Regions:
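Metal-coordinating catalytic core of metallo-dependent amide/deamination hydrolases
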Residues: 66-170
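Conserved small/polar residues in nucleotide/adenosyl-binding loops
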Residues: 173-174
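Residue-level signal for pocket-adjacent positions within structured domains
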Residues: 17, 21, 27, 62, ...
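Metal-associated gating/positioning segment near the N- to mid-region
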Residues: 1-53
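Gly/lys/ser-thr-rich phosphate-binding loops in alpha/beta enzymes
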Residues: 34-89
């Protein structure tokens, strides 16, 4: 259920956007099948809420969402009010296996750490540009340009601001 609904068929398995080791711009809520019959079974077992995350193929796999176990027609009507998004991160075996088998980085734990460092350095620079722009007066904003929007960096900046929580599978020392 969640990003892997049941009954499971390959066309409905949307847990990993395994096209790049860093996919912070994807959101699990866009892959949830709200008609999944497993929700009703879980409710019968007393499960009233879920935190649904992307899979663990990527270093940074995207945003997770908290939902109430209600039978609804849209994911927005299931979202838990005011629950923060989370960011799924994985390091170690899964990213090594997925990308190493393709002869692509990361293929080692060193590659995992390097991918994290690169992403967080870029996110901090993006956040600095946003903060510099926001600190300008309204007049200065009118004659200047806002930083170009970057959906991947927006998610990582949200983590740096403390607005998005991190869920990390297989923590390594970096």
């Amino acid at each position: 259920m969640g990003v892997y609904p049941a009954p499971g068929v390959s066309t409905s398995a949307d847990g990993n956007e395994a096209t790049s080791p860093v996919t912070a711009d994807v959101w699990a809520e866009h892959s949830i099948w709200v008609q999944d019959p497993q929700y009703a079974l879980a409710l019968k077992g007393g499960i009233t809420a879920f935190h649904i995350l992307p899979g663990s193929a990527n270093l940074i796999g995207g945003r997770g969402v908290t939902v109430k176990n209600l039978q609804r027609n849209t994911i927005n009507s299931m979202k838990f009010p005011d629950a923060p998004h989370s960011l799924k991160m994985a390091c170690g075996e899964n990213p090594k296996r997925v990308y190493g088998n393709r002869q692509q980085a990361p293929s080692t734990r060193m590659g995992n750490a390097a991918g994290y460092r690169k992403s967080w350095i870029e996110a901090k620079a993006y956040l600095n540009r946003l903060d510099e722009y926001e600190a300008k007066s309204d007049e200065a904003k009118e004659i200047g340009y806002a930083p170009q929007r970057d959906l991947e960096m927006e998610t990582l900046a949200g983590v740096l601001r403390g607005e998005i929580l991190v869920h990390n599978l297989s923590l390594i020392h970096i």
